[in-house]
């Protein structure tokens, strides 16, 4: 079977019409927004839940981390199925499940029930980021890839902002459990609208695995995983992204509680201030993606070098803010600056992954990135910080976690060695619209 070629430097076109592509982006962005609204609304509710249910910081962190663990566990098989069947229909099912699960959280009456409902939210969200990113990467020209993926994943930051703000405001007026129901409904509406998004045709996996024989599902999975695991750039890029997300998820999850405890502000005001930091991350994610795209034109490895430097800058800023400065406006200003820098990996590293992955495995390759980000990054950060907080205090915990930025930088430097050769290995392979 002839495999059409992917958009390359000489054929940098939209896969579908511009209107269809941008509609797909808008819908995919909107669902990513509510994905993270539903995921992060809980962090602004921590002070209320701690008071009502007498929960430890470790237990509170577990309510955030459980979603990431489930997403990491189910993300790869869900993305593999989406790659073989329909990305659009898969997204509709995912959004419906996580929205209904979020609404269910409203009716829980103890920690165990809420923990189970949050796990179900994660089951619905599993694979969405990778499938949505694969769709965007395929419908748009390569020259826009980092910027659009940065914007798409910035929806995670914007959703976190909205979740924190909505959670704090709703909890102060109607009680903290009402917040879960309020944020779950819009996702159901977007899931219905997503049926109008145009997919791209599934590429024959036999070409991707260089085999013309019929394969069993087990063989297909083994071949796919083997090929992805052998991609050195993918492995190191995923590792670096995970290390940086330990820092990001810790700040996102625990900043409202930090401001409430150490700056002495009310829970709803702490939520608004924390939302400003997350918003800075959303803006930074888009800006860094655009700047890295421009700086790396014709110099692919520079993309990873810039991101490594920004990870080190993030570490330095947060070490100074939480480790050296007293609580006050100056400390908060430095935290906002750190929030702006810390989302530097989002667009560029996603673009790196898509640059080195065969089109037949884009959603699956993105799921590997998502698995690393969720299991080794997003799941670790909130729980580790909560555990350290119970032992050493929240301020000390937040001064230690930024050290993971050094590990992130080292991983990206290592990925630079193989990036260009891995990218050339899949150059010239194209997909077509469905």
Predicted region positions:
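Juxtamembrane intracellular "pre-TM" segments in multi-pass secondary transporters
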Residues: 10-17, 201-238
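Extracytoplasmic gate region of multi-pass secondary transporters
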Residues: 42-43, 232-286, 346, 350, ...
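Helix-breaking motifs and short loop linkers at transmembrane-helix boundaries and internal kinks
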Residues: 54, 86, 107-113, 124, ...
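Conserved MFS/SLC helix-loop-helix module at the cytosolic interface between two early adjacent transmembrane helices
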Residues: 73-109
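Cytoplasmic membrane-interface "Motif A"-like loop-to-helix N-cap segments
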Residues: 84-95, 294-310
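C-terminal ends and interior cores of transmembrane alpha-helices
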Residues: 96-109, 312-326
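Cytoplasmic helix-loop-helix junction between adjacent transmembrane helices
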Residues: 117-157
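Helix-loop-helix hairpin linking two adjacent transmembrane segments in secondary transporters
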Residues: 152-202
């Amino acid at each position: 079977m002839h495999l059409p070629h992917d958009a390359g430097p000489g054929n940098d076109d939209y896969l579908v019409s511009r209107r269809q592509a941008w509609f797909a982006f808008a819908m995919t962005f909107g669902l990513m927004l509510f994905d993270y609204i539903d995921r992060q609304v809980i962090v602004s509710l921590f002070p209320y839940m701690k008071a009502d249910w007498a929960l430890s910081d470790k237990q509170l962190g577990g309510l955030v981390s459980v979603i990431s663990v489930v997403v990491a566990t189910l993300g790869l098989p869900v993305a593999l199925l989406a790659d073989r069947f329909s990305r659009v229909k898969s997204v509709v099912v995912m959004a419906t499940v996580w929205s209904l699960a979020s609404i269910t959280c409203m009716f829980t009456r103890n920690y165990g029930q809420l923990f189970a409902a949050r796990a179900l939210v994660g089951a619905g969200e599993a694979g969405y980021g990778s499938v949505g990113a694969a769709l965007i990467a395929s419908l748009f020209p390569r020259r826009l890839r980092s910027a659009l993926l940065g914007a798409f994943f910035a929806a995670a930051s914007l959703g976190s902002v909205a979740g924190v703000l909505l959670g704090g405001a709703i909890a102060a007026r109607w009680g903290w459990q009402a917040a879960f129901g309020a944020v779950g409904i819009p996702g159901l509406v977007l899931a219905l609208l997503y049926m109008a998004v145009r997919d791209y045709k599934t590429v024959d996996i036999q070409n991707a695995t260089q085999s013309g024989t019929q394969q069993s599902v087990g063989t297909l999975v083994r071949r796919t995983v083997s090929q992805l695991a052998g991609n050195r750039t993918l492995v190191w890029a995923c590792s670096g992204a995970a290390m940086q997300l330990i820092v990001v998820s810790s700040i996102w999850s625990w900043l409202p509680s930090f401001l409430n405890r150490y700056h002495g502000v009310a829970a709803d005001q702490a939520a608004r201030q924390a939302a400003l930091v997350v918003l800075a991350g959303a803006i930074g994610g888009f800006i860094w993606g655009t700047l890295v795209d421009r700086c790396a034109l014709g110099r692919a490895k520079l993309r990873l070098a810039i991101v490594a430097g920004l990870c080190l800058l993030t570490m330095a800023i947060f070490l100074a803010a939480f480790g050296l400065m007293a609580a006050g406006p100056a400390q908060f200003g430095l935290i906002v600056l750190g929030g702006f820098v810390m989302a530097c990996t989002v667009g560029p590293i996603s673009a790196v992954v898509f640059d080195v992955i065969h089109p037949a495995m884009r959603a699956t390759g993105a799921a590997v990135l998502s698995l690393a980000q969720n299991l080794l990054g997003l799941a670790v950060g909130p729980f580790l910080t909560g555990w350290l907080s119970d032992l050493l205090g929240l301020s000390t915990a937040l001064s230690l976690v930024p050290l993971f930025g050094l590990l992130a930088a080292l991983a990206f430097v290592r990925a630079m060695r193989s990036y260009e050769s891995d990218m050339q290995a899949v150059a010239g392979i194209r997909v077509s619209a469905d």
